[in-house]
Amino acid sequence: MTAYRDVDLFLRAHFETTADPSVLDGQIDTVLTATAGRRQQPAWLAALRSHPMSTTARSLGRPLSSPAWALLIILALLVAITAVGLTTGAIRLPAAPIVNGPILFGRFVPAADDTAVFAVRPDGSGEQLVIPAPIECPQLSPDGGRIAVAFGVVNVDGTDRLMFPDTFQGATLGCSTWSPDGRRLAVEGFNDADRTVNGIYLADAEDGGNVVRLTTNGQDGNDVPGDWSPDGRHVAFVRALAGQEIGTIWVADVDTGAAHQVIPNVVGLWVGWSTDGQWLVASRALVPGQASSFILVRPDGTDLRTISPPANHNWATGPTFSPDGTRLAFNMAVGTADKADIYTMRIDGSDVVQITNTPNDNEYFVDWGIDPR
Protein backbone atom coordinates (compact mmCIF):
# COMPACT_ATOMS: atom_id res chain seq x y z
CA MET A 1 0.00 0.00 0.00
CA THR A 2 1.21 3.53 -0.73
CA ALA A 3 1.98 6.13 1.88
CA TYR A 4 -1.23 7.92 0.87
CA ARG A 5 -3.32 5.05 2.13
CA ASP A 6 -1.23 4.77 5.28
CA VAL A 7 -1.76 8.37 6.37
CA ASP A 8 -5.20 8.86 4.77
CA LEU A 9 -4.89 12.43 3.53
CA PHE A 10 -8.36 12.59 2.13
CA LEU A 11 -10.98 14.21 4.35
CA ARG A 12 -12.73 16.56 1.91
CA ALA A 13 -16.21 17.57 2.23
CA HIS A 14 -18.71 20.33 2.07
CA PHE A 15 -22.12 20.96 3.58
CA GLU A 16 -25.13 22.08 1.47
CA THR A 17 -27.44 24.75 2.86
CA THR A 18 -30.77 23.31 3.98
CA ALA A 19 -33.87 24.54 5.79
CA ASP A 20 -37.15 23.01 6.90
CA PRO A 21 -40.63 24.54 6.89
CA SER A 22 -42.04 24.88 10.42
CA VAL A 23 -45.48 25.57 11.88
CA LEU A 24 -45.42 26.73 15.53
CA ASP A 25 -48.39 27.88 17.67
CA GLY A 26 -50.51 28.54 14.61
CA GLN A 27 -47.94 30.82 12.99
CA ILE A 28 -46.33 30.11 9.65
CA ASP A 29 -42.73 31.11 9.00
CA THR A 30 -41.92 31.20 5.30
CA VAL A 31 -38.68 29.44 4.61
CA LEU A 32 -36.81 28.19 1.59
CA THR A 33 -36.23 24.44 1.37
CA ALA A 34 -33.02 23.79 -0.57
CA THR A 35 -32.89 20.03 -0.12
CA ALA A 36 -35.86 17.68 0.00
CA GLY A 37 -35.90 14.73 2.39
CA ARG A 38 -32.94 15.96 4.46
CA ARG A 39 -31.39 13.66 6.99
CA GLN A 40 -31.80 14.27 10.71
CA GLN A 41 -29.18 16.67 12.02
CA PRO A 42 -26.50 14.79 13.98
CA ALA A 43 -26.06 15.62 17.65
CA TRP A 44 -22.51 16.93 17.21
CA LEU A 45 -23.67 19.49 14.63
CA ALA A 46 -26.64 20.52 16.78
CA ALA A 47 -24.25 21.17 19.65
CA LEU A 48 -22.02 23.33 17.48
CA ARG A 49 -24.98 25.32 16.17
CA SER A 50 -26.40 25.93 19.68
CA HIS A 51 -23.33 27.89 20.72
CA PRO A 52 -24.02 31.61 21.47
CA MET A 53 -21.54 32.60 18.74
CA SER A 54 -23.51 30.73 16.11
CA THR A 55 -25.47 32.80 13.59
CA THR A 56 -29.21 32.80 14.28
CA ALA A 57 -31.39 32.02 11.29
CA ARG A 58 -34.05 34.63 10.63
CA SER A 59 -37.51 33.89 9.29
CA LEU A 60 -38.68 35.67 6.17
CA GLY A 61 -41.70 37.94 6.62
CA ARG A 62 -44.03 38.58 9.58
CA PRO A 63 -45.97 35.70 11.21
CA LEU A 64 -49.60 35.55 10.21
CA SER A 65 -52.43 34.88 12.60
CA SER A 66 -54.26 32.46 10.32
CA PRO A 67 -52.48 29.50 8.67
CA ALA A 68 -55.16 29.36 5.99
CA TRP A 69 -54.71 33.00 5.00
CA ALA A 70 -50.95 32.55 5.07
CA LEU A 71 -51.10 29.63 2.67
CA LEU A 72 -53.39 31.55 0.31
CA ILE A 73 -51.03 34.53 0.31
CA ILE A 74 -48.03 32.30 -0.35
CA LEU A 75 -49.85 30.60 -3.22
CA ALA A 76 -50.80 33.97 -4.71
CA LEU A 77 -47.21 35.16 -4.52
CA LEU A 78 -45.96 32.02 -6.24
CA VAL A 79 -48.48 32.47 -9.04
CA ALA A 80 -47.49 36.12 -9.44
CA ILE A 81 -43.78 35.31 -9.50
CA THR A 82 -44.36 32.58 -12.07
CA ALA A 83 -46.34 34.96 -14.27
CA VAL A 84 -43.63 37.61 -14.12
CA GLY A 85 -41.01 35.00 -14.90
CA LEU A 86 -42.89 33.86 -17.99
CA THR A 87 -43.17 37.40 -19.34
CA THR A 88 -39.83 38.90 -18.35
CA GLY A 89 -37.53 35.90 -18.15
CA ALA A 90 -36.05 34.01 -15.24
CA ILE A 91 -35.92 35.75 -11.86
CA ARG A 92 -32.62 35.46 -10.03
CA LEU A 93 -32.72 35.77 -6.26
CA PRO A 94 -29.54 37.09 -4.64
CA ALA A 95 -27.30 34.27 -3.48
CA ALA A 96 -27.19 33.72 0.25
CA PRO A 97 -23.81 34.61 1.77
CA ILE A 98 -21.56 31.63 2.42
CA VAL A 99 -20.98 31.14 6.14
CA ASN A 100 -18.03 29.10 7.36
CA GLY A 101 -19.18 26.15 9.43
CA PRO A 102 -17.38 23.54 11.51
CA ILE A 103 -13.87 22.30 10.81
CA LEU A 104 -13.62 18.51 10.71
CA PHE A 105 -10.41 16.61 11.32
CA GLY A 106 -9.01 13.21 12.17
CA ARG A 107 -7.14 12.43 15.37
CA PHE A 108 -5.00 9.34 15.84
CA VAL A 109 -6.19 7.18 18.74
CA PRO A 110 -3.29 5.00 20.01
CA ALA A 111 -5.56 2.54 21.82
CA ALA A 112 -7.36 1.76 18.57
CA ASP A 113 -4.27 2.25 16.40
CA ASP A 114 -6.56 4.14 14.04
CA THR A 115 -8.40 7.40 13.44
CA ALA A 116 -11.41 9.06 15.07
CA VAL A 117 -13.18 12.04 13.47
CA PHE A 118 -13.89 15.28 15.36
CA ALA A 119 -15.54 18.63 14.60
CA VAL A 120 -14.72 22.05 16.05
CA ARG A 121 -15.88 25.63 15.51
CA PRO A 122 -13.61 27.93 13.47
CA ASP A 123 -12.62 29.71 16.70
CA GLY A 124 -11.43 26.43 18.25
CA SER A 125 -14.30 26.03 20.71
CA GLY A 126 -16.93 23.32 21.09
CA GLU A 127 -14.94 20.28 19.98
CA GLN A 128 -17.20 17.26 19.36
CA LEU A 129 -16.53 13.61 18.54
CA VAL A 130 -18.19 12.74 15.22
CA ILE A 131 -17.17 9.12 14.56
CA PRO A 132 -15.11 7.05 17.04
CA ALA A 133 -12.15 4.96 15.93
CA PRO A 134 -11.50 2.93 13.92
CA ILE A 135 -12.31 4.65 10.64
CA GLU A 136 -10.07 4.76 7.56
CA CYS A 137 -9.65 7.79 5.22
CA PRO A 138 -12.97 9.49 6.12
CA GLN A 139 -14.49 12.08 3.80
CA LEU A 140 -17.72 13.95 4.52
CA SER A 141 -20.48 14.02 1.91
CA PRO A 142 -21.67 17.35 0.47
CA ASP A 143 -24.97 17.15 2.37
CA GLY A 144 -23.18 16.44 5.63
CA GLY A 145 -25.11 13.22 6.20
CA ARG A 146 -22.56 10.53 5.34
CA ILE A 147 -18.85 9.84 5.49
CA ALA A 148 -16.99 7.88 2.83
CA VAL A 149 -14.54 5.33 4.19
CA ALA A 150 -12.36 2.73 2.49
CA PHE A 151 -14.38 1.40 0.62
CA GLY A 152 -17.91 2.27 1.73
CA VAL A 153 -20.04 4.87 3.51
CA VAL A 154 -21.33 5.43 7.03
CA ASN A 155 -23.79 7.92 8.51
CA VAL A 156 -22.28 10.80 10.49
CA ASP A 157 -23.69 9.31 13.70
CA GLY A 158 -21.86 6.04 13.03
CA THR A 159 -24.92 4.03 11.99
CA ASP A 160 -25.64 2.16 8.76
CA ARG A 161 -22.05 1.47 7.79
CA LEU A 162 -22.09 -0.06 4.31
CA MET A 163 -19.00 -1.73 2.91
CA PHE A 164 -18.98 -1.99 -0.88
CA PRO A 165 -17.30 -4.65 -3.06
CA ASP A 166 -13.67 -3.54 -2.81
CA THR A 167 -12.30 -5.06 -6.01
CA PHE A 168 -12.96 -4.31 -9.67
CA GLN A 169 -11.23 -6.03 -12.57
CA GLY A 170 -8.24 -6.85 -10.40
CA ALA A 171 -7.97 -3.46 -8.67
CA THR A 172 -8.50 -3.00 -4.95
CA LEU A 173 -10.68 0.07 -4.32
CA GLY A 174 -9.66 2.25 -1.39
CA CYS A 175 -9.90 5.92 -0.39
CA SER A 176 -12.35 8.15 -2.23
CA THR A 177 -13.69 11.68 -2.70
CA TRP A 178 -17.31 12.76 -3.27
CA SER A 179 -18.81 14.33 -6.37
CA PRO A 180 -20.49 17.70 -5.63
CA ASP A 181 -23.98 16.20 -5.88
CA GLY A 182 -23.07 13.33 -3.55
CA ARG A 183 -24.01 10.65 -6.08
CA ARG A 184 -20.57 9.40 -7.16
CA LEU A 185 -17.20 8.65 -5.63
CA ALA A 186 -13.77 8.97 -7.22
CA VAL A 187 -11.79 6.05 -5.77
CA GLU A 188 -8.15 5.01 -5.79
CA GLY A 189 -7.67 1.60 -7.42
CA PHE A 190 -4.43 -0.32 -6.98
CA ASN A 191 -2.82 -3.74 -7.17
CA ASP A 192 0.82 -4.10 -6.18
CA ALA A 193 1.03 -7.40 -8.08
CA ASP A 194 -0.48 -5.97 -11.28
CA ARG A 195 0.17 -2.24 -11.52
CA THR A 196 -1.52 -1.99 -14.93
CA VAL A 197 -4.83 -1.65 -13.09
CA ASN A 198 -3.61 1.26 -10.93
CA GLY A 199 -5.62 4.42 -11.44
CA ILE A 200 -8.76 6.27 -10.39
CA TYR A 201 -12.20 4.69 -10.69
CA LEU A 202 -15.69 6.20 -10.41
CA ALA A 203 -18.47 4.43 -8.49
CA ASP A 204 -21.99 5.12 -7.23
CA ALA A 205 -22.04 6.40 -3.66
CA GLU A 206 -25.28 4.58 -2.91
CA ASP A 207 -24.00 1.03 -3.30
CA GLY A 208 -20.52 1.15 -4.86
CA GLY A 209 -21.86 -0.05 -8.20
CA ASN A 210 -21.59 1.25 -11.77
CA VAL A 211 -17.78 1.29 -11.57
CA VAL A 212 -15.88 2.82 -14.49
CA ARG A 213 -12.20 3.60 -14.89
CA LEU A 214 -11.20 7.27 -15.07
CA THR A 215 -7.37 7.28 -15.22
CA THR A 216 -4.48 4.93 -15.92
CA ASN A 217 -1.20 5.66 -14.15
CA GLY A 218 0.89 3.95 -16.83
CA GLN A 219 4.15 4.27 -14.89
CA ASP A 220 3.73 1.49 -12.32
CA GLY A 221 2.78 4.12 -9.75
CA ASN A 222 -0.46 5.30 -8.16
CA ASP A 223 -3.12 7.89 -8.99
CA VAL A 224 -4.67 9.19 -5.76
CA PRO A 225 -7.86 11.29 -5.95
CA GLY A 226 -7.65 14.54 -4.00
CA ASP A 227 -10.81 16.50 -4.73
CA TRP A 228 -13.71 16.78 -7.19
CA SER A 229 -14.19 20.19 -8.83
CA PRO A 230 -17.26 22.16 -7.63
CA ASP A 231 -18.87 21.96 -11.09
CA GLY A 232 -18.47 18.16 -11.13
CA ARG A 233 -16.49 18.14 -14.39
CA HIS A 234 -12.98 17.35 -13.14
CA VAL A 235 -11.08 15.41 -10.50
CA ALA A 236 -7.76 16.72 -9.17
CA PHE A 237 -5.31 14.04 -8.12
CA VAL A 238 -1.70 13.22 -7.24
CA ARG A 239 0.19 10.97 -9.67
CA ALA A 240 3.15 9.15 -8.12
CA LEU A 241 5.79 7.01 -9.79
CA ALA A 242 6.49 3.47 -8.65
CA GLY A 243 8.06 3.34 -5.21
CA GLN A 244 7.60 7.06 -4.56
CA GLU A 245 5.62 8.60 -1.74
CA ILE A 246 5.10 11.92 -3.50
CA GLY A 247 3.80 12.86 -6.91
CA THR A 248 2.82 15.59 -9.33
CA ILE A 249 -0.52 17.42 -9.52
CA TRP A 250 -2.93 16.42 -12.29
CA VAL A 251 -6.53 17.11 -13.33
CA ALA A 252 -8.75 14.61 -15.18
CA ASP A 253 -11.92 15.29 -17.18
CA VAL A 254 -14.73 13.18 -15.71
CA ASP A 255 -16.50 12.66 -19.05
CA THR A 256 -13.52 11.83 -21.26
CA GLY A 257 -10.83 10.69 -18.84
CA ALA A 258 -8.34 13.05 -20.49
CA ALA A 259 -5.79 14.20 -17.90
CA HIS A 260 -3.21 16.98 -17.86
CA GLN A 261 -0.35 17.76 -15.52
CA VAL A 262 -0.99 21.07 -13.79
CA ILE A 263 2.51 21.97 -12.57
CA PRO A 264 5.54 20.25 -14.13
CA ASN A 265 8.43 19.60 -11.76
CA VAL A 266 6.43 20.54 -8.66
CA VAL A 267 5.67 17.57 -6.45
CA GLY A 268 3.04 17.39 -3.76
CA LEU A 269 1.22 15.29 -1.20
CA TRP A 270 -2.33 16.59 -1.47
CA VAL A 271 -4.50 18.71 -3.78
CA GLY A 272 -7.90 20.35 -3.35
CA TRP A 273 -10.20 22.85 -5.08
CA SER A 274 -11.39 26.25 -3.93
CA THR A 275 -15.16 26.42 -3.54
CA ASP A 276 -15.46 28.72 -6.56
CA GLY A 277 -13.41 26.33 -8.72
CA GLN A 278 -10.83 28.99 -9.61
CA TRP A 279 -7.87 27.64 -7.63
CA LEU A 280 -6.11 24.47 -6.62
CA VAL A 281 -4.25 24.31 -3.32
CA ALA A 282 -1.57 21.70 -2.72
CA SER A 283 1.06 20.69 -0.20
CA ARG A 284 4.53 21.01 -1.62
CA ALA A 285 6.47 17.83 -0.89
CA LEU A 286 8.72 17.83 2.14
CA VAL A 287 12.40 18.12 1.24
CA PRO A 288 15.07 17.40 3.89
CA GLY A 289 16.55 20.64 5.14
CA GLN A 290 13.82 22.81 3.58
CA ALA A 291 10.64 24.19 5.12
CA SER A 292 7.38 22.81 3.78
CA SER A 293 5.01 25.16 1.97
CA PHE A 294 1.69 25.31 0.16
CA ILE A 295 1.01 26.36 -3.41
CA LEU A 296 -1.94 28.04 -5.08
CA VAL A 297 -2.35 27.62 -8.83
CA ARG A 298 -5.04 27.89 -11.48
CA PRO A 299 -6.30 24.53 -12.80
CA ASP A 300 -4.56 25.28 -16.11
CA GLY A 301 -1.20 25.71 -14.34
CA THR A 302 -1.01 29.50 -14.49
CA ASP A 303 -0.63 32.08 -11.71
CA LEU A 304 1.46 29.85 -9.43
CA ARG A 305 1.88 31.23 -5.90
CA THR A 306 3.72 29.96 -2.83
CA ILE A 307 2.28 30.25 0.67
CA SER A 308 4.66 29.79 3.58
CA PRO A 309 3.40 28.69 7.00
CA PRO A 310 5.06 30.26 10.08
CA ALA A 311 8.85 30.12 10.11
CA ASN A 312 8.99 28.07 13.31
CA HIS A 313 7.03 25.12 11.93
CA ASN A 314 8.51 21.65 11.65
CA TRP A 315 6.17 20.55 8.87
CA ALA A 316 2.71 21.43 7.53
CA THR A 317 0.38 19.71 5.10
CA GLY A 318 -3.24 19.03 4.08
CA PRO A 319 -4.44 22.59 3.27
CA THR A 320 -8.14 23.05 2.50
CA PHE A 321 -10.12 26.17 1.64
CA SER A 322 -12.72 27.68 3.93
CA PRO A 323 -16.17 27.74 2.26
CA ASP A 324 -15.97 31.51 1.76
CA GLY A 325 -12.53 31.18 0.15
CA THR A 326 -10.74 33.60 2.47
CA ARG A 327 -8.75 31.16 4.64
CA LEU A 328 -6.99 27.81 4.64
CA ALA A 329 -7.22 25.13 7.32
CA PHE A 330 -4.30 22.72 7.66
CA ASN A 331 -2.35 20.56 10.09
CA MET A 332 1.07 21.70 11.31
CA ALA A 333 3.76 20.60 13.75
CA VAL A 334 5.59 23.54 15.36
CA GLY A 335 9.23 23.69 16.43
CA THR A 336 10.62 20.25 17.15
CA ALA A 337 7.21 18.64 17.65
CA ASP A 338 6.47 15.52 15.64
CA LYS A 339 2.69 15.70 16.18
CA ALA A 340 0.45 18.17 14.37
CA ASP A 341 -2.38 20.43 15.52
CA ILE A 342 -5.01 22.14 13.36
CA TYR A 343 -4.48 25.77 12.27
CA THR A 344 -6.08 28.29 9.94
CA MET A 345 -4.60 31.29 8.13
CA ARG A 346 -5.46 33.76 5.40
CA ILE A 347 -4.67 32.60 1.89
CA ASP A 348 -1.70 34.99 1.79
CA GLY A 349 -0.14 33.22 4.81
CA SER A 350 -1.00 35.88 7.39
CA ASP A 351 -3.19 35.77 10.52
CA VAL A 352 -2.31 32.24 11.62
CA VAL A 353 -4.74 30.91 14.26
CA GLN A 354 -4.24 27.70 16.26
CA ILE A 355 -7.50 25.71 16.45
CA THR A 356 -6.50 22.64 18.48
CA ASN A 357 -3.81 22.21 21.12
CA THR A 358 -3.13 18.53 21.79
CA PRO A 359 0.65 18.02 22.13
CA ASN A 360 0.30 14.27 22.61
CA ASP A 361 -2.07 13.66 19.68
CA ASN A 362 -1.52 13.78 15.93
CA GLU A 363 -4.27 15.44 13.86
CA TYR A 364 -4.87 15.42 10.10
CA PHE A 365 -7.64 15.00 7.44
CA VAL A 366 -8.58 18.66 7.73
CA ASP A 367 -11.88 19.72 6.12
CA TRP A 368 -13.99 22.85 6.43
CA GLY A 369 -17.76 22.68 6.07
CA ILE A 370 -20.39 25.26 5.18
CA ASP A 371 -22.79 26.31 7.93
CA PRO A 372 -25.79 24.10 7.03
CA ARG A 373 -28.52 26.66 7.75
Predicted regions mapped to residue ranges:
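Beta-propeller blade-edge and WD-like acidic-aromatic loop motif
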Residues: 102, 108-128, 150-165, 184, ...
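Membrane-interface helical sensory segment of bacterial ECF anti-sigma factor regulators
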Residues: 1-5, 9, 21, 33-108, ...
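Conserved beta-propeller blade repeats
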Residues: 93-96, 132-150, 168-188, 218-238, ...
